[in-house]
UniProtKB/Swiss-Prot annotation:
Produces ATP from ADP in the presence of a proton gradient across the membrane. The gamma chain is believed to be important in regulating ATPase activity and the flow of protons through the CF(0) complex. This is ATP synthase gamma chain. It is found in: Cell membrane. One of its GO terms (biological process) is proton motive force-driven plasma membrane ATP synthesis. InterPro entries: ATP_synth_F1_ATPase_gsu (IPR035968), ATP_synth_F1_gsu (IPR000131), ATP_synth_F1_gsu_CS (IPR023632). It is a peripheral membrane protein. Its main location: membrane. Keywords: ATP synthesis, Cell membrane, CF(1), Hydrogen ion transport, Ion transport, Membrane, Transport. It holds the Pfam family ATP-synt. Belongs to the ATPase gamma chain family. The lineage of its organism: Bacteria, Bacillati, Bacillota, Clostridia, Eubacteriales. Disulfide bonds: none annotated.
Length: 283
């Protein structure tokens, strides 16, 4: 019986050791990917902030009844949900899904959804969301190219009056231990009043002529920034999850090795007792 127990424990130790090697490797890969995409986020944050300030200046000068500022007559909303293409990243995907579930429970009218990421596509289909478009296979270090089709589709719906608001639901990177799910409105533009200045901003051609073209660039830049935030958060969550799994495997291996040694000691003691008992019987 003791021998059978030792074999079972040894098999479990071997299985957990193999799993530990996988989680450790995945943690190292996530750390490497995190480092790369985080550098891009730092650079993109500065560019996005500057670009947004220019768009705000433009919006202040444009006619306020412009559809990109005042909005159109549609009450229907569009949400763009950013998820990962792969799993094993803790609660990263579940948090985005939960946020949209919360929004759906509060909204009076059903909204349209654009999903980005294989996991989002899978979850939202299962939950019977009104999905307009689906996009998968987003690179680990995304570029502006990944925003083209999504923004084109969203703007087409907005210009046709099928939707009156474009929002994005994504995970904003705060630090390696903190990421928050954010809902950000992209359209209509929210004009932020700036402090009184001692200079005048003049646009040529006029702000109204420019806004039609620049709003697409603005949306693409904002979406790219959100995707990069999402990718950094994903890799950070995966790194944390894999580190936790590796530590749990270590703890479990310590317990199993202790249990194995106890079982082995018991088996040896039993064998010695049987040998001594047999020798005594022969006297």
């Amino acid at each position: 019986m003791a021998g059978a127990g030792l074999v079972t424990i040894k098999r479990r130790i071997k299985s957990i050791t193999s799993t530990q090697k996988i989680t450790k490797a995945m943690g190292l890969i996530a750390t490497s990917k995190l480092r790369k995409v985080r550098k891009k986020l730092e650079a993109n944050n500065k560019y996005c902030e500057l670009f947004s300030s220019i768009v705000n200046e433009l919006a202040m000068e444009a006619e306020q009844n412009n559809i990109y500022i005042k909005g159109n007559k549609s009450n229907k909303k569009l949400y763009i949900a950013l998820n990962s293409d792969t799993g094993l990243c803790g609660g990263f995907n579940a948090n985005v899904v939960n946020e949209l579930n919360s929004i759906r429970s509060k909204e009076k009218e059903d909204f349209l959804l654009i999903t980005m990421g294989q996991k989002g596509k899978m979850y939202f289909r299962r939950l019977n969301y009104n999905i307009e478009s689906e996009y998968i296979d987003i690179p680990d270090v995304p570029t502006i190219k990944e925003t083209e089709d999504v923004v084109y589709k969203a703007l087409e719906l907005y210009r046709n009056g099928e939707i009156g608001e474009i929002n994005i639901v994504f995970t904003k990177f705060i630090s390696t231990i903190k990421q928050n799910v954010i809902v950000e409105k992209l359209l209509p533009l929210e004009v932020k009043k700036v402090e009184k200045r001692n200079f005048i901003v003049k646009f040529e051609p006029s702000a109204d002529e420019m806004i039609e073209d620049i709003v697409e660039l603005h949306l693409r830049q904002k979406l790219l920034n959100c995707i990069i935030n999402s990718k950094v958060s994903e890799q950070s969550s995966r790194m944390t999850a894999m580190d936790g799994a590796t530590k749990n495997a270590n703890d479990l291996l310590d317990e199993l090795n202790l249990q194995y040694n106890r079982e082995r000691q018991t088996a040896i003691t039993q064998e010695i007792t049987e040998i001594v008992g047999g020798a005594e019987a022969l006297k």
